[in-house]
């Protein structure tokens, strides 16, 4: 049974009104910027500085994902969680999880785009100025 453990993040974000604004993956970090509802000038940055496995999906398939039992610990409109025994975590490479032990599953929920991250390090959170999203020629 998936167990959700809410993570306290400041500023508190109403996940229903937020969305993933930008995701960048470099050789040494994964950076995810989320919309802070009501603040057009800043974003909430979630940063992982180690090897990770990620999954990005819409909120609808996440809610309809086949789990054996109800989800324990979900808080209405909450944004960030540490999750145990969810399908995303249990179906990943055992070798990767062994070499990255202890790997923890983090889930960031918005009203549109959700982000799952499997990581051996905790994420850091910071409020940053919004910048124009890069485009490619």
Tell what function each PLM region has.
Residues 1-137:
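Surface-exposed, interaction-prone regions used to assemble/regulate multi-protein complexes
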């Amino acid at each position: 049974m998936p167990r959700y453990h809410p993570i306290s993040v400041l500023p508190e974000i109403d996940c229903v009104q937020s969305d993933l604004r930008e995701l960048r993956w470099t050789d040494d970090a994964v950076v995810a910027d989320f919309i802070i509802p009501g603040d057009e000038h800043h974003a909430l940055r979630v940063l992982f500085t180690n090897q990770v496995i990620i999954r990005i999906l819409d909120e609808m398939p996440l809610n309809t994902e086949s789990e054996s039992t109800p989800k324990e610990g979900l808080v209405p409109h909450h944004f960030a969680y540490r999750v145990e025994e969810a399908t995303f975590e249990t179906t990943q490479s055992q070798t990767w999880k062994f070499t990255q032990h202890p790997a923890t599953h983090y889930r960031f929920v918005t009203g549109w785009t959700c982000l799952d991250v499997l990581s051996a390090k905790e994420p850091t959170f910071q409020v940053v100025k919004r910048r124009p999203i890069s485009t490619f020629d």
